[in-house]
Amino acid sequence: MNNSAFTFQTLHPDTIMDALFEHGIRVDSGLTPLNSYENRVYQFQDEDRRRFVVKFYRPERWTADQILEEHQFALQLVNDEVPVAAPVAFNGQTLLNHQGFYFAVFPSVGGRQFEADNIDQMEAVGRYLGRMHQTGRKQLFIHRPTIGLNEYLIEPRKLFEDATLIPSGLKAAFLKATDELIAAVTAHWREDFTVLRLHGDCHAGNILWRDGPMFVDLDDARNGPAVQDLWMLLNGDKAEQRMQLETIIEAYEEFSEFDTAEIGLIEPLRAMRLVYYLAWLMRRWADPAFPKNFPWLTGEDYWLRQTATFIEQAKVLQEPPLQLTPMY
C-alpha cells in the first residue's frame, strides 16, 4: 500500500463498531468525527455512558513500533502526573488491529480551548512542559525520528521538484524561493542541542483547559530540541513573544533546565514547519478529504502567497533571533 495514495474509503462505521466490539466496547451513540486529516478520529459513548475517542492510524505512516513508542511515552507522562491523553489498554495492549488498520482508544477529555494570550495559562503550560521534558529526558525514542533538515527540508524539496500541483508558470519562482529558504535555514541550523522526547506538535490547538492544561495528540512525537515544544505557543509582536517566552521558561525551569541558546532555532524551526506542512498536503492529495478541505492548493494565488511567505521567512532568518531580557 502506497502511503501517499492511501485513502480511508474502506473504513466504514460498521467496521469501526466491529473493531470496538471485538475488544468489549459497545457503541451506544453515533460516531462523531473529530477534526483530523492525517488519521481518522471519532468520539463515541459506550453502553455505560462513558465517552471515548478512537483513533485509526493512517497505514504506513508509522510502524507498530513507532506507535507503541508514542503510547509508552504518553503512559510514562501520566505516571509522572503530566496531564496527557493516554491510550486505554485492553489485556495489556494499547495498539489494536482490525482488518489491517491499527487503532487505539483514548478517554474523551473535554475542556475549553487553551487561551494563548492568557499569561496565567501560559505559565501553567510552561510548568507542565518542564515536567513533560523531565520525563522526555529519561530515554530517547529508538524507532521514531529526530527533527532534522532531511525530513523537513530536503525530502520536501524533491517532492516539489516533481509536483504537478504547482502551476507551471509559477514553479521556477517557487523552487527558487524554496532553495533560498533551505539555504538560510541550513546556515542557521545547529545540531549540538540536547535531544529529548518531545510532544512534537505543541500548539494551542493541541492543549485543552480544564482547571489546568491537558495535552492531546502525541501523533507527531519525536526526538529533538526542547524549544520545539515552546515556540509554537508564541504569538503577537516581538515584545509580546518575548514576554510569553520568558513566562514559559521561568515556569519550565521549575522542573527542567532550558538552554537559552536554543532560542536561535525558533525561526529555522518555523521555516522547516512551513516547508514540511506544504509537502504533507501534497503527499496526501490522493486522499479525497484533502482536495475537499484544501481546495485552494490548486489555485495560482496560493502559490504566489506561498512563494512570498518563503521569501519573507528567509529574510527573517537574517535578522537577530528573539532576545530575552538581560536577567536571562
UniProtKB/Swiss-Prot annotation:
Signal peptide: none annotated. Its cofactor is Mg(2+). Induction: Induced by the two-component Cpx system that responds to extracellular stress. GO terms for cellular component: cytoplasm. One of its GO terms (molecular function) is protein serine/threonine kinase activity. Keywords: ATP-binding, Cytoplasm, Kinase, Magnesium, Metal-binding, Nucleotide-binding, Phosphoprotein, Serine/threonine-protein kinase, Stress response, Transferase. The active site is at 201 (proton acceptor), 217. Monomer. This is Stress response kinase A. It comes from Escherichia coli (strain K12).
